Protein backbone atom coordinates (compact mmCIF):
# COMPACT_ATOMS: atom_id res chain seq x y z
CA UNK A 1 0.00 0.00 0.00
CA UNK A 2 1.55 3.37 -1.00
CA UNK A 3 2.33 5.81 1.80
CA UNK A 4 0.55 9.15 2.13
CA UNK A 5 3.79 10.76 0.92
CA UNK A 6 3.75 8.69 -2.27
CA UNK A 7 -0.01 9.15 -2.79
CA UNK A 8 0.42 12.91 -2.59
CA UNK A 9 3.18 12.77 -5.18
CA UNK A 10 1.03 10.80 -7.60
CA UNK A 11 -2.01 13.06 -7.09
CA UNK A 12 0.09 16.19 -7.62
CA UNK A 13 1.51 14.72 -10.82
CA UNK A 14 -1.94 13.98 -12.22
CA UNK A 15 -3.32 17.39 -11.28
CA UNK A 16 -0.35 19.22 -12.78
CA UNK A 17 -0.59 17.16 -15.96
CA UNK A 18 -4.17 18.41 -16.42
CA UNK A 19 -2.80 21.97 -16.60
CA UNK A 20 -6.02 23.31 -15.12
CA UNK A 21 -3.98 24.99 -12.40
CA UNK A 22 -0.81 25.79 -14.34
CA UNK A 23 0.11 28.63 -11.99
CA UNK A 24 1.15 25.96 -9.50
CA UNK A 25 3.30 23.91 -11.87
CA UNK A 26 6.40 23.56 -9.69
CA UNK A 27 8.83 20.78 -8.74
CA UNK A 28 7.54 18.02 -6.47
CA UNK A 29 8.49 18.88 -2.86
CA UNK A 30 10.52 16.42 -0.80
CA UNK A 31 8.86 17.30 2.53
CA UNK A 32 5.50 15.78 3.49
CA UNK A 33 3.97 19.06 4.68
CA UNK A 34 5.06 20.82 1.48
CA UNK A 35 3.45 18.07 -0.59
CA UNK A 36 0.26 18.37 1.46
CA UNK A 37 0.17 22.12 0.87
CA UNK A 38 0.79 21.78 -2.87
CA UNK A 39 -1.86 19.08 -3.31
CA UNK A 40 -4.38 21.11 -1.34
CA UNK A 41 -3.60 24.24 -3.34
CA UNK A 42 -4.06 22.37 -6.62
CA UNK A 43 -7.34 20.74 -5.65
CA UNK A 44 -8.64 23.98 -4.08
CA UNK A 45 -8.20 25.81 -7.38
CA UNK A 46 -9.43 23.03 -9.65
CA UNK A 47 -12.72 23.80 -11.42
CA UNK A 48 -15.73 21.57 -10.79
CA UNK A 49 -14.95 19.26 -13.70
CA UNK A 50 -14.87 15.44 -13.83
CA UNK A 51 -11.76 13.75 -12.45
CA UNK A 52 -10.06 10.65 -13.76
CA UNK A 53 -10.66 7.32 -12.06
CA UNK A 54 -6.92 7.09 -11.42
CA UNK A 55 -6.96 10.36 -9.50
CA UNK A 56 -10.08 9.49 -7.52
CA UNK A 57 -8.61 6.15 -6.47
CA UNK A 58 -5.50 7.92 -5.19
CA UNK A 59 -7.53 10.55 -3.39
CA UNK A 60 -9.72 7.89 -1.79
CA UNK A 61 -6.65 6.09 -0.46
CA UNK A 62 -5.07 9.32 0.83
CA UNK A 63 -8.22 10.55 2.56
CA UNK A 64 -8.84 7.09 4.02
CA UNK A 65 -5.39 7.38 5.61
CA UNK A 66 -6.25 10.86 6.88
CA UNK A 67 -9.53 9.57 8.29
CA UNK A 68 -7.69 6.77 10.13
CA UNK A 69 -5.24 9.24 11.71
CA UNK A 70 -7.67 10.50 14.38
CA UNK A 71 -10.44 9.22 16.63
CA UNK A 72 -13.80 10.68 15.54
CA UNK A 73 -15.76 12.71 18.07
CA UNK A 74 -19.29 11.49 18.81
CA UNK A 75 -22.14 13.22 20.62
CA UNK A 76 -21.24 11.45 23.87
CA UNK A 77 -17.81 13.12 23.71
CA UNK A 78 -19.34 16.61 23.51
CA UNK A 79 -19.87 18.97 26.42
CA UNK A 80 -23.31 18.92 27.99
CA UNK A 81 -25.20 22.17 28.58
CA UNK A 82 -28.20 23.13 30.68
CA UNK A 83 -30.40 22.06 27.76
CA UNK A 84 -30.74 18.30 27.36
CA UNK A 85 -30.69 18.34 23.55
CA UNK A 86 -27.97 20.99 23.12
CA UNK A 87 -24.26 20.20 23.29
CA UNK A 88 -20.98 22.02 22.74
CA UNK A 89 -17.90 20.82 20.91
CA UNK A 90 -14.74 22.92 20.87
CA UNK A 91 -12.44 21.80 18.08
CA UNK A 92 -12.29 20.83 14.42
CA UNK A 93 -15.75 20.21 12.96
CA UNK A 94 -14.25 17.78 10.45
CA UNK A 95 -13.70 15.28 13.28
CA UNK A 96 -17.36 15.05 14.32
CA UNK A 97 -19.05 11.70 13.70
CA UNK A 98 -22.63 12.97 13.61
CA UNK A 99 -25.44 12.69 11.09
CA UNK A 100 -24.62 16.09 9.60
CA UNK A 101 -22.31 19.05 10.02
CA UNK A 102 -23.21 22.52 8.79
CA UNK A 103 -20.84 24.22 6.36
CA UNK A 104 -20.70 28.00 6.08
CA UNK A 105 -20.73 28.18 2.29
CA UNK A 106 -20.63 30.99 -0.27
CA UNK A 107 -23.25 31.76 -2.90
CA UNK A 108 -21.49 29.64 -5.54
CA UNK A 109 -21.75 26.62 -3.19
CA UNK A 110 -18.61 25.10 -4.74
CA UNK A 111 -16.22 25.51 -1.84
CA UNK A 112 -13.31 27.89 -1.42
CA UNK A 113 -10.98 28.28 -4.42
CA UNK A 114 -8.24 30.15 -2.52
CA UNK A 115 -5.20 27.85 -2.14
CA UNK A 116 -4.76 26.58 1.44
CA UNK A 117 -7.21 29.15 2.78
CA UNK A 118 -8.09 28.85 6.46
CA UNK A 119 -11.88 29.07 6.15
CA UNK A 120 -14.19 26.24 7.17
CA UNK A 121 -15.52 25.92 3.60
CA UNK A 122 -12.01 25.17 2.35
CA UNK A 123 -11.28 22.66 5.11
CA UNK A 124 -14.54 20.77 4.65
CA UNK A 125 -14.30 20.57 0.86
CA UNK A 126 -10.63 19.56 0.89
CA UNK A 127 -11.01 16.66 3.30
CA UNK A 128 -14.45 15.50 2.22
CA UNK A 129 -12.79 15.02 -1.16
CA UNK A 130 -13.22 16.43 -4.64
CA UNK A 131 -16.47 14.53 -5.20
CA UNK A 132 -18.09 17.10 -2.91
CA UNK A 133 -17.39 19.97 -5.31
CA UNK A 134 -18.81 17.90 -8.16
CA UNK A 135 -21.95 17.14 -6.13
CA UNK A 136 -22.39 20.82 -5.34
CA UNK A 137 -21.89 21.70 -9.00
CA UNK A 138 -24.71 19.31 -9.90
CA UNK A 139 -26.98 21.05 -7.38
CA UNK A 140 -26.11 24.48 -8.76
CA UNK A 141 -26.55 23.39 -12.37
CA UNK A 142 -30.02 22.07 -11.61
CA UNK A 143 -30.88 25.18 -9.59
CA UNK A 144 -29.67 27.52 -12.31
CA UNK A 145 -28.82 30.43 -10.02
CA UNK A 146 -26.62 31.35 -7.08
CA UNK A 147 -27.57 30.07 -3.66
CA UNK A 148 -29.65 32.57 -1.69
CA UNK A 149 -28.69 33.63 1.82
CA UNK A 150 -30.52 31.66 4.49
CA UNK A 151 -31.29 28.55 2.44
CA UNK A 152 -29.81 25.07 2.96
CA UNK A 153 -28.67 22.19 0.77
CA UNK A 154 -27.77 18.60 1.73
CA UNK A 155 -24.92 16.50 0.33
CA UNK A 156 -22.98 13.44 1.36
CA UNK A 157 -19.96 14.13 3.60
CA UNK A 158 -17.88 11.63 1.60
CA UNK A 159 -14.59 11.08 3.49
CA UNK A 160 -15.54 12.99 6.65
CA UNK A 161 -16.77 11.04 9.71
CA UNK A 162 -20.16 12.77 9.45
CA UNK A 163 -22.74 11.22 7.13
CA UNK A 164 -23.92 14.45 5.52
CA UNK A 165 -23.09 18.11 5.09
CA UNK A 166 -25.71 20.84 5.17
CA UNK A 167 -24.48 23.88 3.23
CA UNK A 168 -25.88 27.31 4.07
CA UNK A 169 -24.88 30.83 3.01
CA UNK A 170 -24.88 33.39 5.79
CA UNK A 171 -25.06 37.19 5.60
CA UNK A 172 -21.95 39.38 5.37
CA UNK A 173 -21.28 42.26 7.73
CA UNK A 174 -18.78 44.99 6.85
CA UNK A 175 -16.31 45.50 9.68
CA UNK A 176 -17.52 48.17 12.06
CA UNK A 177 -21.07 48.16 10.71
CA UNK A 178 -24.11 47.67 12.92
CA UNK A 179 -26.02 44.40 12.57
CA UNK A 180 -29.31 45.38 10.94
CA UNK A 181 -32.55 43.53 11.71
CA UNK A 182 -32.55 42.23 8.13
CA UNK A 183 -29.11 40.65 8.47
CA UNK A 184 -29.95 39.28 11.90
CA UNK A 185 -33.02 37.61 10.40
CA UNK A 186 -30.99 36.24 7.49
CA UNK A 187 -28.60 34.59 9.94
CA UNK A 188 -31.53 33.14 11.87
CA UNK A 189 -32.89 31.76 8.59
CA UNK A 190 -29.65 29.81 8.09
CA UNK A 191 -30.29 27.97 11.35
CA UNK A 192 -33.99 27.43 10.70
CA UNK A 193 -33.42 26.17 7.15
CA UNK A 194 -30.70 23.79 8.32
CA UNK A 195 -32.91 22.44 11.11
CA UNK A 196 -35.88 22.01 8.77
CA UNK A 197 -33.71 20.16 6.27
CA UNK A 198 -32.24 17.93 8.98
CA UNK A 199 -35.71 16.87 10.11
CA UNK A 200 -36.85 16.34 6.53
CA UNK A 201 -33.84 14.05 5.98
CA UNK A 202 -34.58 12.09 9.15
CA UNK A 203 -31.35 13.10 10.89
CA UNK A 204 -30.85 12.67 14.64
CA UNK A 205 -27.71 14.76 15.24
CA UNK A 206 -26.64 18.06 13.71
CA UNK A 207 -23.52 20.15 14.38
CA UNK A 208 -23.56 23.88 13.65
CA UNK A 209 -20.43 25.89 13.00
CA UNK A 210 -20.53 29.58 13.95
CA UNK A 211 -22.14 30.69 10.69
CA UNK A 212 -20.92 33.99 9.16
CA UNK A 213 -18.46 34.80 11.97
CA UNK A 214 -15.32 34.04 9.96
CA UNK A 215 -14.73 35.54 6.53
CA UNK A 216 -18.23 37.05 6.46
CA UNK A 217 -17.52 39.27 9.47
CA UNK A 218 -20.67 38.81 11.58
CA UNK A 219 -19.91 39.93 15.17
CA UNK A 220 -19.37 36.84 17.30
CA UNK A 221 -21.47 37.94 20.28
CA UNK A 222 -24.55 38.77 18.24
CA UNK A 223 -24.09 35.64 16.12
CA UNK A 224 -23.99 33.38 19.18
CA UNK A 225 -27.08 35.02 20.63
CA UNK A 226 -28.99 34.65 17.36
CA UNK A 227 -27.89 31.03 16.94
CA UNK A 228 -29.01 29.92 20.40
CA UNK A 229 -32.25 31.92 20.46
CA UNK A 230 -33.20 30.65 17.00
CA UNK A 231 -32.52 27.01 17.85
CA UNK A 232 -34.41 27.19 21.15
CA UNK A 233 -37.38 28.90 19.48
CA UNK A 234 -37.36 26.33 16.66
CA UNK A 235 -37.34 23.48 19.17
CA UNK A 236 -40.30 24.99 21.01
CA UNK A 237 -42.21 25.25 17.73
CA UNK A 238 -41.31 21.69 16.68
CA UNK A 239 -41.97 19.41 19.66
CA UNK A 240 -41.79 16.43 17.33
CA UNK A 241 -38.09 17.18 16.82
CA UNK A 242 -37.02 16.13 20.31
CA UNK A 243 -34.98 13.29 18.82
CA UNK A 244 -32.71 15.80 17.04
CA UNK A 245 -29.55 16.44 19.07
CA UNK A 246 -27.90 19.76 18.26
CA UNK A 247 -24.23 20.56 18.74
CA UNK A 248 -22.74 24.04 18.61
CA UNK A 249 -19.18 23.77 17.34
CA UNK A 250 -16.74 26.47 18.41
CA UNK A 251 -13.23 26.91 17.07
CA UNK A 252 -11.94 30.04 18.81
CA UNK A 253 -11.66 30.64 22.55
CA UNK A 254 -13.90 33.70 22.17
CA UNK A 255 -16.68 31.64 20.61
CA UNK A 256 -16.35 28.97 23.30
CA UNK A 257 -16.64 31.53 26.10
CA UNK A 258 -19.76 33.05 24.52
CA UNK A 259 -21.54 29.73 24.05
CA UNK A 260 -20.53 28.54 27.52
CA UNK A 261 -22.16 31.66 28.95
CA UNK A 262 -25.30 31.74 26.82
CA UNK A 263 -26.11 28.05 27.22
CA UNK A 264 -26.70 28.54 30.93
CA UNK A 265 -30.45 28.95 31.34
CA UNK A 266 -30.11 32.10 33.40
CA UNK A 267 -28.19 33.70 30.51
CA UNK A 268 -30.18 32.38 27.56
CA UNK A 269 -29.91 35.48 25.36
CA UNK A 270 -33.31 36.86 26.25
Swiss-Prot record:
Top-level taxon: Bacteria
Catalysis: reaction(s): 4-O-(ADP-D-ribosyl)-L-aspartyl-[protein] + H2O = L-aspartyl-[protein] + ADP-D-ribose + H(+)
InterPro entries per the UniProt record, alphabetical: Macro_dom (IPR002589), Macro_dom-like (IPR043472)
EC number: 3.2.1.-
Binding, Zn(2+): 112, 117, 119
Cofactor-binding details, from the entry: Binds 1 Zn(2+) ion per subunit.
Pfam families: Macro
Required cofactor(s): Zn(2+)
Any GO molecular function: poly(ADP-ribose) glycohydrolase activity
Sequence positions that bind ADP-D-ribose: 92-93, 106, 119-121, 212-216
Limits of the Macro domain: 73-267
UniProt keyword terms in alphabetical order: Glycosidase, Hydrolase, Metal-binding, Zinc
Function: ADP-ribosylhydrolase that specifically reverses the SirTM-mediated mono-ADP-ribosylation at an asparatate residue of GcvH-L, by releasing ADP-ribose from the target protein. May play a role in the regulation of the response to host-induced oxidative stress.
Family per similarity comment: Belongs to the MacroD-type family. Zn-Macro subfamily.
Name of this chain's protein: Protein-ADP-ribose hydrolase
Organism: Streptococcus pyogenes serotype M18 (strain MGAS8232)
